[in-house]
Amino acid sequence: MQAVWMILSSFLFATMGVCVKYASAYFNSSELVFYRGVLGVLFMAAYARASGSSLRTRVPAMHAWRSVIGVMSLSAWFYAIAHLPLATAMTLNYMSSVWIAAFLVGGALMLGKPGKKGPSQGPLVLAILASFAGVVLLLRPAMDQNQAFAGLIGLMSGLGAAFAYMQVMAISRLGEPETRTVFYFAVGTAVAGALGMGVMGVSPWNWQHALWLPPLGILASLGQLTMTRAYSMSENHRGTLMVANLQYSGIVFAALYGLILFGDNIPLVGWAGMALIIVSAIAATVLRARAAPDAPAEEH
């Protein structure tokens, strides 16, 4: 059953990407971030009240720092969705597992522990190199279409997501529940979006265009909650790994959405790069789980 919950979560995140792509034609990135945050706050506050969860935290500074990193990643992801094929933007954002694996390898090398440099790191290094080779293949068509900058921003969204995830790991080790973490991230998102709107301005309001805004926060919150449910139902390490790898089904959903709704034309070399990233990211997830077997669910 946990597999169904994770596939549902991936579907919800991909559907949120569709809403972002449509809404980006009428609203700037700061507005999208703001509405995603405000609606997320309302939804998570209602959920916490219904479930009897307290939103009072002992580590506000850690939540604030997580929000800063997360907002940067989210803004970059929304920009990439607006300017790249949906599946391409989703794939680049889902590279957070690869970035985390790269951090683990880099940390082992910096610590200078001989045991960490041995064969145990070899497969992880190969997975990282394969993933970045996939990025080159994936972004090659984008460069031909003058989308190189958007591709770079999309790549940075995955890097930011990796930093945010490591902060979530630190927060979870202090006993903070997922509901509270998601709530305070939504608060930070709303505040950052409001500040951004003060700089970038507010777009003309049209109720037909605004219909794309409510799903942003709702789908994101539902996606995170169903992902958490999937992880919580995993009874052993193998089940957790299966759930973690099923998150990449979101790329498949995004590809289908892109073909059906937006007519995205991704050349064969782009599909090959996407497949290589998915395979290497799954490998990195499995190998990374050995270093952090009790890590919390990743957020998007």
Language-model regions: role of each:
Residues 102-105, 120-140, 269-288:
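Hydrophobic transmembrane alpha-helices of multi-pass small-molecule transport proteins
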Residues 44, 142-204, 296-300:
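Transmembrane alpha-helical segments that form core, pore/gating elements
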Residues 2, 27-72, 100-103, 160-164, ...:
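Transmembrane alpha-helices of multi-pass small-molecule transport proteins
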Residues 31-34, 38, 81-116, 240-257:
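Specific alpha-helical transmembrane segments that line the substrate/conduction pathway
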Residues 111, 244-300:
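C-terminal-most transmembrane helix of multi-pass membrane proteins
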Residues 6-7, 58-69, 116-131, 150-155, ...:
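Cytoplasmic-side transmembrane-helix entry/capping segments in multi-pass membrane proteins
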Residues 1-9, 49-78, 149-157, 204-222, ...:
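Loop-to-transmembrane-helix transition segments
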Residues 89-95, 175-188, 225-257, 287:
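Helix-helix packing/entry segments at the starts of transmembrane helices
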